[in-house]
């Protein structure tokens, strides 16, 4: 595996030296320290992701992008390289964009870009696997005006780490972004067709409403997600609420916080997915050290969900030092 990664890096650097494109790299690393057991706390240094890629503009209508992501993989070695993006973008006009290949999924891109701290924690849909970061398929973006954008995608549905399933089923979705003074809104709907037929199965739908507010030194954002017929099981509903705030206090320093809450319910009003639900709180401070280098100190607290009448779970608190460096 180490040899493959070395060959990958050398190939990208060599390709860049003979092209007019841009080669880039981004690394996420951290140190985490458990605050739960002061006598014998868990502690760890970790490089969670190393991303390498190359972008090339072919002409004023076509461009290409290839990206590899080296990260942890439960089914592989400690560090496994995946082809994360391999896309061709066609721009027939300055308002229409068509992407083909392994492309970035649009499900959570709006909040991911606004949150802007993927190296600290992914957006809700990403970290909870409601969707994949990227997938093979085709996407269309149409800029109707400076304030209105629509997009649509058809994807394999299995993510960039997997091939298409044997049945050839796909997933699709569409969204709309509305921009006003200092605010942006997105509504979107994603569908995963059922793969089995019967009274207990139905297509899965993810409905998303997201909002962003940006001022001179303050940004706020929030999203509500409702997943109907989760995993194509009829009436298995999942819901999630995620909000964040970021305050710039000067000298390239900002304070930030985030709160996520997830829940579920089936046809009998049971919390069917309770083992994967709860409340997440992140509070921290971030410093832009120089161009391409960010560091953040933060506390992540997760409290697992409990049934009505049960004693509340104890929060699991972790102290993190996160680093992002890109070039």
Q: Where would I find each of the regions flagged by the language model?
A:
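Sec-dependent N-terminal signal peptides
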Residues: 4-13
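Sec/Tat signal peptide C-region and signal peptidase I cleavage site
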Residues: 15-19
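Outer-membrane beta-barrel pore domains
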Residues: 24, 28-41, 76-78, 86-91, ...
């Amino acid at each position: 595996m180490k040899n493959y990664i070395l060959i990958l890096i050398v190939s990208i650097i060599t390709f860049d030296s003979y092209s007019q494109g841009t080669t880039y790299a981004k690394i996420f690393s951290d140190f985490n320290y458990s605050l739960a057991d002061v006598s014998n706390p868990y502690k760890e240094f970790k490089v969670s992701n190393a991303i390498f890629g190359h972008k090339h503009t072919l002409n004023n209508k076509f461009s290409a992008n290839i990206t590899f992501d080296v990260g942890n993989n439960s089914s592989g070695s400690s560090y496994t390289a995946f082809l994360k993006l391999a896309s061709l973008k066609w721009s027939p006009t300055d308002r229409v964009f068509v992407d083909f290949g392994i492309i970035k999924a649009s499900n959570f891109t709006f909040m991911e870009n606004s949150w802007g701290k993927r190296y600290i924690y992914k957006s809700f849909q990403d970290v909870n696997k409601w969707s994949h970061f990227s997938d093979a398929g085709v996407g269309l973006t149409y800029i109707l005006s400076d304030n209105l954008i629509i997009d649509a995608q058809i994807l394999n549905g299995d993510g960039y780490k997997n091939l298409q399933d044997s049945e050839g089923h796909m997933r699709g979705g569409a969204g709309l972004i509305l921009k006003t003074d200092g605010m942006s809104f997105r509504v979107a709907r994603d569908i995963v067709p059922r793969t089995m037929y019967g009274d207990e199965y139905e297509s899965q739908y993810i409905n998303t409403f997201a909002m962003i507010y940006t001022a001179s030194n303050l940004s706020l954002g929030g999203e509500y997600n409702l997943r109907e017929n989760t995993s194509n099981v009829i009436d298995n509903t999942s819901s999630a609420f995620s909000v964040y705030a970021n305050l710039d206090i000067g000298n390239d320093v900002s304070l930030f916080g985030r709160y996520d809450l997830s829940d579920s319910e089936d046809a009998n009003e049971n919390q069917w997915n309770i083992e994967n639900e709860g409340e997440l709180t992140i509070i921290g401070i971030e410093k832009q050290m120089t161009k391409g280098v960010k560091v953040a100190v933060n506390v992540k607290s997760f409290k697992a969900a409990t049934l009505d009448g049960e004693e509340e779970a104890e929060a699991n608190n972790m102290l993190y030092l996160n680093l992002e460096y890109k070039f």
